[in-house]
């Protein structure tokens, strides 16, 4: 039996029984799903159960549950136990992207795409190297493409705020992110029908995790209980296939050189682009924008001053070198990842009987159990971060830089760099970069951004009602 310990404390800890709150089969899992989606929200769902049972490691139910998947998981809700999920000797990532739920393979051409592969599988290393090569080939286009795309987005937001006195950031952001990902990572600008097809593909595969503002009973019966058959996505997937087979042909050429067939590679590419890259960047920027607006004019003034000073020193351009000089911008981006992670759960299956350590105890997990790390509680762990439940913009400046390691996301520590043979997201560095680029673009344009911000973690949208342009 192996031991997994994410804590740096070298103390003897007691072996404790994991509280089991899975309850009555089916009934408790359905009740818990209602709590997760409608009664509590996901943060309160985990936090209340941790508090009630006085344990950050729990056997509990997780969505989607009946009848789409087995709801039982072992929850890891602190910074000590969470990194168990990063250790390939202890956990398997085979088919565990979304826990015990997995859409039919027919959604992805009959292939298990990279997100469902374990690093030990040969195809995983090959396709991940293809992604690295594609990023390297397009590296010089990232910044100019982002700046152009998001300046265009803010032009449209300016017009809407002027005409309607408000603008919904999510609507503009998702279209801009889609365009950026297409231009920066593939090549040709994706048409509107490609954008719509990607959104449909995401919904048809992952509807058990989605709410759409409909009555709970309707969503439960329509979305959450049973997976959709793949034929509902056939026409939209065909549009994605055609876009990537032509626009991404240069990536498919490289895949063939590495030893993958074009047919298999295109399905990996579609999933990684439409799910991992598009959804990941969209969510990252929405949450970052929310907390910058919520923080108000004092932080915005400091960010504007830093951004403009550095850009002046870089001959008026946003550059990689300049972005690295923006210490407050970097800290704010990392604090957003810490405080409100873009991906909030990570999974892995125990490869053998394990002893997992929290800060104050040891817990035995059986081989084959699904482990579910709830990231916001791990990255808001008060044993690691002071003022853990506050958004602290300068947290990672000066001596605080050493805490970046504990910003756990993308299947690794904050300081980990992805490699072809590990499970760290291939676009991890790109995620941090685009957050910093958004801040730079914003504060070269505006002195102040105001809006209505949701109070809970689930309320990510911002209704913008003020965009004060830089005084000329």
Curated annotation (Swiss-Prot):
Alphabetic keyword roster: Fatty acid biosynthesis, Fatty acid metabolism, Heme, Iron, Lipid biosynthesis, Lipid metabolism, Lyase, Metal-binding, Oxylipin biosynthesis
Induction: Induced by treatment with salicylic acid (SA) and osmotic stress.
Residues given in the record as heme binding sites: 425
Cofactor needs: heme
Enzyme Commission number(s): 4.2.1.121, 4.2.1.183
Highest rank taxon of the organism: Eukaryota
BP terms from Gene Ontology: oxylipin biosynthetic process; sterol metabolic process
Molecular function in Gene Ontology: heme binding; hydro-lyase activity; iron ion binding; monooxygenase activity; oxidoreductase activity, acting on paired donors, with incorporation or reduction of molecular oxygen
A Pfam family the protein falls into: p450
Keyword Lipid biosynthesis (UniProt): yes
Free-text tissue specificity from the UniProt record: Expressed mainly in bulbs, and at lower levels in roots.
Alphabetized CDD domains for the sequence: CYP74
Pathway membership: Lipid metabolism; oxylipin biosynthesis
Catalytic activity: (13S)-hydroperoxy-(9Z,11E)-octadecadienoate = etheroleate + H2O; (13S)-hydroperoxy-(9Z,11E,15Z)-octadecatrienoate = etherolenate + H2O; (9S)-hydroperoxy-(10E,12Z)-octadecadienoate = colneleate + H2O; (9S)-hydroperoxy-(10E,12Z,15Z)-octadecatrienoate = colnelenate + H2O
Protein task: Divinyl ether synthase involved in oxylipin biosynthesis. Catalyzes the conversion of (13S)-hydroperoxy-(9Z,11E)-octadecadienoate (13-HPOD) to etheroleate and (13S)-hydroperoxy-(9Z,11E,15Z)-octadecatrienoate (13-HPOT) to etherolenate. Catalyzes the conversion of (9S)-hydroperoxy-(10E,12Z)-octadecadienoate (9-HPOD) to colneleate and (9S)-hydroperoxy-(10E,12Z,15Z)-octadecatrienoate (9-HPOT) colnelenate.
Family per similarity comment: Belongs to the cytochrome P450 family.
Protein name: Divinyl ether synthase CYP74
Protein species of origin: Allium sativum (Garlic)
Lineage of producing organism: Eukaryota, Viridiplantae, Streptophyta, Embryophyta, Tracheophyta
């Amino acid at each position: 039996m192996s031991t997994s310990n994410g804590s740096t404390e070298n103390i003897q800890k007691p072996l404790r029984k994991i509280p089991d709150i899975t309850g009555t089969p089916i009934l408790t899992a359905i009740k818990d799903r209602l709590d997760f989606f409608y009664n509590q929200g996901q943060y309160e769902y985990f936090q209340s159960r941790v508090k009630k049972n006085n344990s950050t490691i729990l056997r509990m139910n997780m969505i989607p549950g009946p009848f789409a998947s087995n709801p039982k998981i072992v929850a890891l809700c602190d910074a000590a136990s969470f990194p168990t999920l990063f250790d390939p000797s202890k956990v398997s990532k085979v088919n565990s992207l979304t826990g015990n739920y997995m859409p039919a393979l027919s959604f992805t051409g009959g292939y298990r795409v990279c997100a469902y592969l374990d690093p030990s599988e040969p195809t995983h290393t090959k396709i991940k190297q293809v992604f690295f090569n594609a990023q390297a080939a397009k590296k010089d286009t990232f910044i100019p493409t982002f700046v152009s795309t998001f300046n265009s987005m803010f032009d449209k937001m300016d017009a809407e705020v002027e005409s309607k006195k408000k603008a919904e950031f999510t609507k503009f952001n998702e279209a801009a992110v889609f365009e950026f990902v297409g231009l920066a990572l593939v090549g040709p600008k994706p048409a509107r029908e490609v954008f719509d097809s990607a959104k449909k593909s995401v919904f048809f595969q992952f509807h058990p995790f989605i709410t759409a503002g409909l009555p709970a009973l309707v969503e439960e019966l329509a979305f959450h209980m049973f997976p959709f058959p793949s034929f509902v996505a056939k026409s939209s997937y065909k549009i994605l296939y055609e876009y990537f087979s032509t626009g991404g042909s240069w990536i498919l050429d490289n895949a063939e050189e590495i030893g993958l067939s074009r047919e298999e590679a295109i399905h990996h590419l579609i999933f990684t682009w439409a799910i991992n890259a598009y959804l990941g960047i969209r969510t990252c920027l929405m949450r970052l924008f929310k907390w910058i607006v919520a923080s108000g004019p004092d932080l915005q003034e400091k960010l504007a001053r830093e951004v403009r000073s550095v850009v002046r020193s870089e001959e008026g351009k946003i550059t990689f070198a300049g972005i690295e000089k923006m210490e407050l911008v970097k800290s704010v981006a990392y604090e957003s990842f810490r405080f409100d992670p873009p991906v909030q759960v990570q999974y892995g299956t125990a490869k053998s009987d394990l002893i997992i350590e929290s800060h104050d105890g040891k817990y035995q997990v059986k081989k084959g159990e699904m482990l579910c790390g709830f990231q916001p509680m791990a990255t808001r762990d008060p044993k690691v971060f002071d003022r853990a439940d506050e958004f602290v913009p300068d947290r990672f400046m000066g001596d605080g830089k050493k805490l970046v390691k504990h910003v756990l996301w993308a299947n690794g520590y904050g300081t980990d760099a992805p490699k072809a043979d590990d499970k760290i997201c291939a676009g991890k560095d790109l995620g941090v970069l685009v957050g910093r680029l958004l801040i730079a673009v914003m504060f070269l344009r505006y002195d102040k951004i105001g809006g209505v911000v949701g109070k809970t973690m689930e309320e990510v949208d911002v209704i913008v009602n003020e965009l004060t342009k830089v005084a000329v």
